[in-house]
C-alpha cells in the first residue's frame, strides 16, 4: 500500500516536472559539462529517461535506415556514439540511487527497469542493425582496422 502511494507521488511529481526545466535535458553550465547535482531532483529522472531512450532509439533507427553500404564508421562507430544522453542519465541515476537512495528513488528504479530492458532488447534483437554489423564484420580483414576498432567490431558482432 505504501509503495503505491509513493509511486503515485512520484508520478504526480513527474507530471509537474514536465513544466519545469529538467537539468538532464539542458546543457550543463558547470565546468567540463559536469552534472549540476544541486539542480537535479528525483522527479527529473523519469522524464529524462523517457527522453533519452527516445533519443537513443532514434539514433539506432538512423543507423538501420542509412541507405549507404555498412561501414565501420556509419555502423559500428555510430553505435558506439549512440545513447550518450541515456548513458549520462543512467550513470547519474544508478550511482545516486546506490549512494543516497530513498523510497522515491526506488519507485523511479522500478519504473525505469522495464523501460531499460525494452531498450536493451530493442538494440540487441534489432535484425536490421545486426545485418549491418554482420556486413562490416564479414569484411573486417580488408578494413585495416586498429586493434581497438577490431575489438569493438568483434564485441558488437558477438553481442
Which ranges hold each PLM region?
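Bacterial Sec-dependent N-terminal signal peptides
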Residues: 1-21
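Zn2+-dependent metallopeptidase catalytic domains
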Residues: 18-159
Amino acid at each position: 500500500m505504501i509503495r503505491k502511494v509513493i509511486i503515485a507521488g512520484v508520478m504526480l511529481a513527474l507530471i509537474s516536472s514536465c513544466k519545469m526545466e529538467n537539468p538532464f535535458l539542458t546543457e550543463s553550465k558547470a565546468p567540463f559539462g559536469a552534472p549540476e547535482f544541486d539542480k537535479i531532483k528525483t522527479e527529473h529522472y523519469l522524464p529524462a529517461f523517457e527522453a533519452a531512450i527516445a533519443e537513443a532509439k532514434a539514433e539506432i533507427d538512423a543507423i538501420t535506415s542509412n541507405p549507404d553500404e555498412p561501414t565501420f564508421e556509419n555502423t559500428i562507430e555510430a553505435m558506439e556514439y549512440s545513447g550518450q544522453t541515456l548513458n549520462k542519465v543512467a550513470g547519474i541515476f544508478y550511482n545516486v540511487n546506490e549512494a543516497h537512495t530513498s523510497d522515491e528513488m526506488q519507485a523511479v528504479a522500478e519504473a525505469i527497469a522495464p523501460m531499460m530492458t525494452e531498450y536493451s532488447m530493442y538494440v540487441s534483437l534489432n535484425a536490421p542493425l545486426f545485418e549491418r554489423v554482420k556486413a562490416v564484420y564479414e569484411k573486417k580483414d580488408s578494413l585495416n582496422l586498429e586493434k581497438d576498432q577490431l575489438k569493438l567490431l568483434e564485441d558488437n558482432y558477438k553481442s
